[in-house]
Curated annotation (Swiss-Prot):
Signal peptide: none annotated. GO terms for cellular component: cytoplasm. HAMAP family: HisB. Keywords: Amino-acid biosynthesis, Cytoplasm, Histidine biosynthesis, Lyase. PROSITE patterns: IGP_DEHYDRATASE_1 (PS00954), IGP_DEHYDRATASE_2 (PS00955). Pathway: Amino-acid biosynthesis; L-histidine biosynthesis; L-histidine from 5-phospho-alpha-D-ribose 1-diphosphate: step 6/9. This is Imidazoleglycerol-phosphate dehydratase. InterPro entries: IGPD_sf (IPR038494), ImidazoleglycerolP_deHydtase (IPR000807), ImidazoleglycerP_deHydtase_CS (IPR020565), Ribosomal_Su5_D2-typ_SF (IPR020568). It catalyses: D-erythro-1-(imidazol-4-yl)glycerol 3-phosphate = 3-(imidazol-4-yl)-2-oxopropyl phosphate + H2O. It comes from the Bacteria. Its main location: cytoplasm. Its EC number is 4.2.1.19. It is found in: Cytoplasm.
Amino acid sequence: MRKAERARTTNETDIKLAFEIDGEGKADISTDVPFMTHMLDLFTKHGQFNLTVDAKGDTEIDDHHTTEDIGICLGQAFLEALGDKKGIKRYGSALVPMDEALAQVAVDLSNRPHLEMRAAFPQAKVGTFDTELVHEFLWKLALEARMNLHVIVHYGTNTHHMIEAVFKALGRALDEASSIDPRVKGVPSTKGML
């Protein structure tokens, strides 16, 4: 089974995370960052993963450390769960509407971490959540999972809807990229490795 667990304890956060690629969209998420909890639920459901997260952090300061460290743990668990990457599709993309917002995510599980993000959120906060943390989370996810991740929010007026579309598209794109294609022999690269 393609799954992995991660634990990370620092002076700022305490995180336990379990991730399964070939899941059923089951999420058991407990964080002290409610908006991130909501986004991880959406990501899990739309990616058909199984994800358990128990995360506590110094949110009396702000949500930065908790959000960043969840991204680190999820990226590491995703990379480990992929294993040797034999037979995966490698590439995935999704275009997802959420009411008036439209987001697109494209991913390459290339072992070359990069984040390219084009999103102009109209509001700096959704509730108490700083919207700049979306970039922070995605960058740490891409870095630790060693993926090339492109995120474009084409348009939208409601910041919540725009971010929600991103997380749904992220789940769907990663589901596609991590899927096993029986036609693929070895890893999908002319180099013979990823």
